[in-house]
Amino acid sequence: MKNNPLLIFIGCCLVPLILAYLALKLEWIPSASSNKGEFLKQEIKLQDWKKTEHKQWTIALNHPAQCQQACAQQLQALENLYIALGKNQGKVDVAILGQTQQKELPWRQLPEVDVLQPASLYLIDHMGLVVLQYPYHSEPQQNRLTQKGLLKDLKKLLNYSRSS
């Protein structure tokens, strides 16, 4: 009877540890993530990024020279995304990676990055690290869903990093 409280105490300490161990080993915990974009498989840091001042996040469109129709659609989507940011426009830059045929774009143009997919949108942090990819889909509805996902991810990131 004297050892009963001690056994209860030890049991209360050990049972959660055993359950946590079993949950990890038997994969009872789902491995879901809340981001809509795809993390890149390799780290890509843009060269010459530090030479100019950048805002917290940059939405970038990879626009190689051979990309025409898909990139033109994505340019229009990029403009709509920037408008949809609303009050957060001051915290986000927009950039084009490569050369466009439109000369009057209000966004920064940076050198093309060969390892990135053509016509895809990317989120780049203020240090020049490409963080998330949002691939281009030829089906307009799927493309709109991808762009909405980018907007959700960006708003989450801006909310998490409340500096400036």
Please state what every model-predicted region is.
Residues 27-46:
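Alpha-helical transmembrane signal-anchor/signal-peptide segments
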Residues 42-57:
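A short beta-strand-turn-helix
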Residues 64-70, 102, 138-139:
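Short acidic, S/G/P-rich loop/turn micro-motifs used as interaction or catalytic elements
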Residues 75-120:
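Structured, soluble extracytoplasmic/luminal domains of envelope-associated proteins
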Residues 78, 119-137:
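A short, hydrophobic beta-strand/beta-hairpin element that forms part of a small beta-sheet core
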Residues 131, 135-164:
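Thiol-/selenol-based redox modules, centered on thioredoxin-like
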